[in-house]
C-alpha cells in the first residue's frame, strides 16, 4: 500500500538479564540473531586480540564465567522423549542417567551438521535441550516437523523455553 514510503523499520533486540553489567564492564557487543552478546571486554586502548588473550590467560589461571542466556532452550517431555532424542541426535540417549547432561550433534538429512548443544535429563521422560543461538528457532521447527510428520506415533511434546531461562 505504501510502496517505498515505509520509514524506519523496527528491529527488536534481546538482551540478557545481566546486559547492564556487561555494559558497565566495557563489553564490545556482537549481534547474535536478535541478541546482543558480549564479544570481549577491552581495558583502556586494548584491541580485540589483546583483550581476548588477557581474558583467556586469566581464565586459565583463575576462573571465568560466560553469559549463555542467548543459547536456545527447548523443554522435551513425554514417555517417548528418550527415543525421540535417540533419533534426532547422532549419539545415544536412552541410558543417560537422570541429573546428567550430554553433548549432542544433530544432522540434516544430507548428513551435514545442523546444530549441536547439551541436553540434560531432568527426570525419566523430561529433558532440557540447549541449541546454538543462531539455530534455536530452526531446531524447534525441525523437532516439531519430525514429531508431526515423520514420527507422529511418538508421544513427545517440545516447547521453547529460551525466554524463560537465563544462564551463566
Go through the PLM ranges and name each one:
Residues 1-168:
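Glycine/proline-enriched, intrinsically flexible loops and inter-domain linkers
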Amino acid at each position: 500500500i505504501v510502496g517505498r514510503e515505509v520509514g524506519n523499520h523496527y528491529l527488536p533486540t534481546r538482551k540478557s538479564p545481566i546486559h547492564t553489567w556487561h555494559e558497565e564492564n566495557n563489553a564490545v557487543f556482537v549481534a547474535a540473531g536478535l541478541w546482543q552478546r558480549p564479544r570481549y571486554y577491552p581495558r583502556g586502548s586494548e584491541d580485540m586480540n589483546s583483550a581476548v588473550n588477557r581474558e583467556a590467560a586469566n581464565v586459565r589461571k583463575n576462573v571465568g564465567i560466560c553469559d549463555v542466556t542467548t543459547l536456545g532452550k527447548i523443554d522435551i517431555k513425554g514417555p517417548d522423549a528418550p527415543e525421540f532424542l535417540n533419533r534426532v541426535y547422532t549419539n545415544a540417549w536412552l541410558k543417560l542417567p537422570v541429573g546428567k547432561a550430554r553433548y549432542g550433534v544433530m544432522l540434516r538429512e544430507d548428513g551435514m551438521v545442523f546444530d549441536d548443544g547439551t541436553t540434560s535429563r531432568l527426570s525419566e521422560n523430561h529433558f532440557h535441550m540447549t541449541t546454538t543461538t543462531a539455530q534455536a528457532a530452526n531446531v524447534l521447527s525441525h523437532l516439531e516437523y519430525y514429531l508431526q510428520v515423520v514420527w507422529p506415533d511418538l508421544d513427545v511434546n517440545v516447547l521453547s523455553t529460551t525466554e524463560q531461562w537465563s544462564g551463566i
